[in-house]
Amino acid sequence: MEKDKTFKYNTEIIGTTKVHSVKSDYKIRIKNEITYKGLEDDLYRFNIVESLYALDDYEDPIMTQIAEMTNRICSIYKEIEIGINAEGIIEKVFNRDQIRDKWQKVKAWLTNAHPLESYEVIRAKEFELSNEEMEIKNIRFIHFLHQYFFIFRQSVDSGGTKYIKKNEMDRFGAGVVIPVNINLREKDLENGAIERNYEGKMVRDNKVIERLRQFTKDNYMHPEYKMTGKYVYDNITLLESDFTITEELGEFYYNHSYLRLTLEE
C-alpha cells in the first residue's frame, strides 16, 4: 500500500436482529476513505474518514430510535486515525482529543432529544472516553472495522490452513468478550491477487457461557457465535471482502449481519 494514497470503499450491511418478540431487518450503506500514513513505532497508521452513513431500512420504531442514538454516538468516529499492529489489532488512537470534542456536541444532542433514554448511555460513554485503554478496546469491536483489519497481514501457505484465536464482543450490549477460533485458508488468484477465506466459531468457555446466560436470564441456553469471511488482497491493499457475523443467545436474542465491501475504481 502506497503511503499517503487514499482508497475509497463502499460498504453495504444487511441484517436481522431479534430481541425478545421484536424482530427487525435493517440495511445500511457506508462510504469510507482510507489513507495509509506509514509505519510508526511498529504500527501501521491509517486515517479513516466516513463520507456517508445511510440507514436505508429499519422496521421497528423503537429499534429505529435506538439506532438513531447509536448512530449519533458513532458519529464521533467519522474521522479516526489508528495504529494497527502486525496482527490487525488496533493499539493506538491518534486523534482522541478530536473525538472527545465531537462527543461534547453529541452529548448535548442526546440530552435534549432523548433525556431519559440516554442518561445511562451518556454516563457509560463519559467513563469510556476518560479511559484510553477502555476506549481502544471498544473501538476494536466497531463492527465495520472488521472488514479492513480482521485478518490484516495474516498470511497462509497456499492450500494450507492457519489457526488463529480472536476476541469478539457480543452484539447485544452484555459487555461479554467472546473468544473465537478462526480457520484461515489462502489461495492465489489468476490476476495476481490473494484470496483469504476464514471460518470462526466461539470457544466453549464456561465463564463466558455463564455470563451470557446471566444476561439473557436463561440458565439453559447454549450461545452461538459464528463468523465467515472472504478477503481479496493486492499485497496489503484490500480489494473486496464479504463478512458475516451470526450471534444467537437462546430463543430471544438473535443477530445476523452480512457486510459487503468493495474498493471504488
Where do the language-model regions lie?
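Acidic, serine/threonine-rich low-complexity disordered tracts
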Residues: 1-84, 153-265
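Hydrophobic transmembrane alpha-helix bundles
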Residues: 85-88, 117-120, 259-261
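Acidic, serine/threonine- and glycine-rich low-complexity intrinsically disordered segments
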Residues: 90-201
